[in-house]
Amino acid sequence: VDKPLVVIVQGSPRMDGNCAALALDAFNACDARGCDAVIVSASMLMTSGGHPCNGCENCVSTGSCVYEDEVTLLYQMLDSASGLLWITPIYFASVPGQLKAMIDRFQFFWARRSRGETLKFETRRPAAALIVGSGNDPFGTEAVEIPLTSASNIAEFNLSKPTVLMELDEPDAILREENAGMREIAHETIRTFVDAVLKWEG
């Protein structure tokens, strides 16, 4: 029997920071619960051959993206997934540019609806998000949550209310003993998310 697949999108350009640590925690939690998990680094994806959307609308007219790159492999992965977990830092009250470029490529999923294609799933699959900040941005996290919600929705996932973790000022802050409580909050979000994935799988 195939295991449920969980896609973990790591949105930070840092490969060894707080988001990367939480992505590894999520990977291990999924594995422990009998799920297959894959960590997708948006930064690596979009700086090692992934193209930003150029607005050509080839996906609308033909049903396929004009680019044949690793992002098209992500489409296939998301179509096969039972859950989607976003983990991203806050950059100027929004998401990092590499993650936004990846999200813009979700136009492919929007084109399916534009072309009148039938949704692949009767019920939306679960999605969750961990949003990591180094301070209390006076502009809040709405500009982070909206693109994650929109992208999840168009790819046939239902994003639950994101968990926001603030005051993580250093790249390794989430691993420090004084932030153990915050890490546990993240772990609880991950556990709840995996519960939802397994429930969706039935």
Where in the sequence are the language-model features?
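Alpha-helix termini
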Residues: 24, 95, 117, 146-148, ...
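A short, flexible beta-alpha/helix-coil linker loop
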Residues: 133-136, 168-172
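Beta-strand-loop-alpha "switch" segments that mediate conformational coupling across diverse proteins
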Residues: 160-169
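N-terminal beta1-alpha1-beta2 submodule of the flavodoxin-like/Rossmannoid cofactor-binding fold
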Residues: 1-111, 172-202
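Short, glycine-/small-residue-rich phosphate/pyrophosphate-handling segment
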Residues: 114-161
